[in-house]
């Protein structure tokens, strides 16, 4: 399916859901509590399908990531992969890196909703890069 078609269907789904549900909602999907904003694509996907990029978690299971005691989630966004990893790899420590204020604050809120899972997640609001230089005062996500 082409991107334009996906966007078209997402708009229809969003409009239908908004008839019955508020824009901001707290839900439980696949054993994880989420604070979602249904006007955002990833949030809407989790609300409708229960997860986002579940293929990453499935590949991690096939690679037997549980035998490793540390997982690094770079570009953690609001914790989608970190929380799924914590749920599936209970003996691993997850180090999550997210530079943007908006996503990081949302990540912290989702960790607070998942106290048991958050014990193994260590969030860091930092930038990773190949050069040492000053960090801009305002940082925006490309999708925000």
Q: Which role does the model predict for each range below?
A:
Residues 1-144:
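Phosphate/nucleotide-binding beta-alpha loop and adjacent structural elements of enzyme active sites
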